[in-house]
């Protein structure tokens, strides 16, 4: 799979670098985005990714967040943030108004994942999605013992989890194909959140989470 991410005119792609100011999965996301890109970060929380991309890589970023406290924190850090419901209000963004849309550890918490992905593919030719993997071996073991899965990637108990659409990597990749996406790159993480590499037969068993670089139909890199 190709890791190239075309951006706006004059944008430069970077080699992977260390991002000490970002959590591990967001550092991987940042390395997939070319300098100078127009970036929309859905579920941006305190705006950490947008702030990093703007200050260090010349990107133009906008965050979307529904938590009012997180919105205030992001604005206080100098990030452009819009308070919107990802499930219901993405139609407010124009077609191809961004180069890339990021949805980091949020898809499983949306009410209508298919509609959210459809809106993302309308807004930008490339999407980056990160998700926890419900198929991790320790999750399966907990289920066999009659307990709901928990891990560093899924730290919530059954009664307070925001996750309502849990999926394994196999489930997710089938779903992405059905939605018309091409997976250009997949980065795997182990149960502790470190970047890892396994052959396909083991990825769904050993991965705690994954980041996907997606191209909408007709926009995949040859």
Predicted regions: what they are:
Residues 19-36:
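Conserved alpha-helix/loop element of class I SAM-dependent methyltransferases that forms part
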Residues 47-51:
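Glycine-rich SAM-binding Motif I of class I
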């Amino acid at each position: 799979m190709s890791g190239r991410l075309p951006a706006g005119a004059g944008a430069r792609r970077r080699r992977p670098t260390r991002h000490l100011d970002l959590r591990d999965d967001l550092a991987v996301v940042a390395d997939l985005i070319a300098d100078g890109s127009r970036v929309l970060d859905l579920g941006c929380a305190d705006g950490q990714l947008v702030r990093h991309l703007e200050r260090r890589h010349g990107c133009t970023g906008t965050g979307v967040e529904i938590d009012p406290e997180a919105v205030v924190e992001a604005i206080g850090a100098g990030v452009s943030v819009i308070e919107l419901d990802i499930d219901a209000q993405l139609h407010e963004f124009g077609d191809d108004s961004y180069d890339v849309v990021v949805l980091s550890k949020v898809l499983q918490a949306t009410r209508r994942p298919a509609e959210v992905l459809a809106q993302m593919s309308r807004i930008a030719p490339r999407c980056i999605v990160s998700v926890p993997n419900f198929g991790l071996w320790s999750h399966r073991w907990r289920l066999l013992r009659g307990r709901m899965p928990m891990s560093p990637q899924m730290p919530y108990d059954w009664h307070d989890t925001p996750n309502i659409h849990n999926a394994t990597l196999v489930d997710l990749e089938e779903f992405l194909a059905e939605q018309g996406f091409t997976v250009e790159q997949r980065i795997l993480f182990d149960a502790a959140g470190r970047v890892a590499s396994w052959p396909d037969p083991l990825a769904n068993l050993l991965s705690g989470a994954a980041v996907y670089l997606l191209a909408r139909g007709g926009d995949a890199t040859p």
